[in-house]
Swiss-Prot record:
SUPFAM superfamilies: Glucocorticoid receptor-like (DNA-binding domain) (SSF57716). Gene3D superfamilies: 1.10.287.1480. Its main location: plastid. This is Small ribosomal subunit protein uS14c. Binds 16S rRNA, required for the assembly of 30S particles. The lineage of its organism: Eukaryota, Viridiplantae, Streptophyta, Embryophyta, Tracheophyta. NCBIfam families: PRK08881.1. HAMAP family: Ribosomal_uS14_1. Part of the 30S ribosomal subunit. Keywords: Chloroplast, Plastid, Ribonucleoprotein, Ribosomal protein, RNA-binding, rRNA-binding. GO terms for molecular function: rRNA binding; structural constituent of ribosome.
Amino acid sequence: MAKKSLIQREKKRQELKQKYHSIRLYLKKRMSEASLLDEKWEISEKLQSLPRNSAPTRLHRRCLLTGRSRANYRDFGLSRHVLREMAHACLLPGVIKSSW
C-alpha cells in the first residue's frame, strides 16, 4: 500500500489538471496561431504562470485499490498484484486465465 500522502498528492494533481485543462488548451492554440515573436513570448509567460502540478505530464497512474504506481494496467486501473488476485476470485468479468 502506498503512503496516503502520495495518493492525496496525486488526487490533487488530477484536480488541478482538470481545473486548468481548458485554459492550457486555449493558450496552446493561441501559441500555434501567433505569428509575432512578442506575442508568442507573452503567451508562453502565461503558460508558465499556470501551476506546475496542473501539467498532465506530472500525473502518474496509480492502482485504484492500493495506490501502487508501478505495473498498472490501463484497462482496469489496477496493479498487476491486485489484477491477478481479482481475476482468480472471478471479480473481473470476461477475464480468464489463459492455457495452451
